[in-house]
Amino acid sequence: MKLLIADDEILTRNGLVTSIDWKSLGIDQVFEASDGMEAYNTACTSKPDIILSDIRMPRLSGIEFAEKIKEILPDTSLIFMSGYSDKEYLKAAIRLKAITYVEKPLDLQEVKDSVQEAINEHQTRLQTRSSMKLQSKETSSRLAQLLTRPYNEKQEEIDELTDKLSI
């Protein structure tokens, strides 16, 4: 899995990169960005599974960055960090379906727990998608089988399967 850490404070970025054993959490690659625009460009090229982003950053705020990135990477999990408890930031985080909102100064255990929650959500999403694909394949296969038989015998089953497939 890939993680992008976006924060304009170099000490925060370096602290997160060096203080947490990302490999033990299943994070293979960690990317960094020092502002919202760099975060956007990095996310477009690296396609992270999880983004850990500060709210207030130069050039593009964390909220603006997240809104833009959700358009092209809708399955990316968001975790916001901020030293400010502004209600508008919290509303924006909820609207963007962020995993959580971690307050600064950061508690490393809280960050790890948040990332683990994002990993779990990502894996659940992949399993659900895989199950849906399998079910769709099975339904399509069954429909193809029914369509190769005499039509008048299986009209009810054909209708049921076409409804399932929305065709």
Annotate each PLM feature.
Residues 57:
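Receiver (REC) domain active-site loop signature in two-component systems and cognate sites
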Residues 106-167:
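Interdomain helical linkers/hinges and coiled-coil/dimerization scaffolds
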Residues 35-38, 61-64, 82:
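Acidic catalytic/metal-coordinating carboxylates
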Residues 32-50:
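Acidic, metal-coordinating helix/loop segments flanking the phosphotransfer/catalytic sites
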Residues 7, 54:
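Active-site residues of response regulator receiver
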